[in-house]
Amino acid sequence: MSMIWNHSAAGRWGVGLGLSVLALLGAPASADAAHVKGRLEGFRLLRNPVWAEAKDPTNHGYSFREAVPTVRADFRRPFPHIPKELCVALLATAPQKAPPPVLVRVGGGRTTPVTIVVPPGTRLTFQNTDPFKHRLYGVDIKTFMPADQGQGAQREWTPATPGTYEIRDEAAPSLRMWIVAEPTVASITYPSMKGEFSVNVQQPGEYTLQAFFAGKKVGDAVPVKVDAADVDLRAAIKVMDQKTADAEEKASEEKAAKAAKAQDAK
């Protein structure tokens, strides 16, 4: 399902993260909002950088099980949980105001969401939902240094300038989150497991749809003109193709093999 959190009375921000985050993102959208509806494809080919990092033996991380030949190849390859990893952003032609504070849950070895796109100046509140402490920090971010965060505790941080910021956890090395501070983002949403999405639009105008994964743009930018009525995109937005995915997988495997060889030589 799709969720909205309000920017004052405007209700411009949409997040489709499902029932598990109803308490996180708050109020319903304005009844006057139009919606841009569409579908993503190729998302099962996306590869979270955490997986590639885990293959490096020098990190002493977890390892993947041997492939089972009786299982179909497309199920033997990891694929992302796009309802919180793949963010669909609606970009306006002018800078947007920051919305009210956004709650990010930290639990189960991950954050919810994993990638988020917000205007600079948006206050993010990180809440620990695990029964043990976390030590979040921002990579190369002097204003977000490691600090203990116990069960239920909250911690706030605001991206002041445009850019991409990575959040990690000293207590859980596989936890990685990406915050994209984009001045023109007017609304965001997260797709269903089938890739379907609906993003709300409060003001008519010219917009651009752009998907983000692991802090980076994926797929082509799609121009959209919104009037009073909903817009249904006929063509699916491809966020990854097989050729590129295979090339990235090959490069990852070669890097892991090289690291393993160097490790054995020590």
In which residue ranges do the predicted regions lie?
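N-terminal secretory signal peptides that target proteins for export/translocation
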Residues: 1-11
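N-terminal leader/targeting segments
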Residues: 3-5, 17, 35
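Extracytoplasmic copper-binding redox domains, predominantly the cupredoxin/blue-copper superfamily
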Residues: 31-266
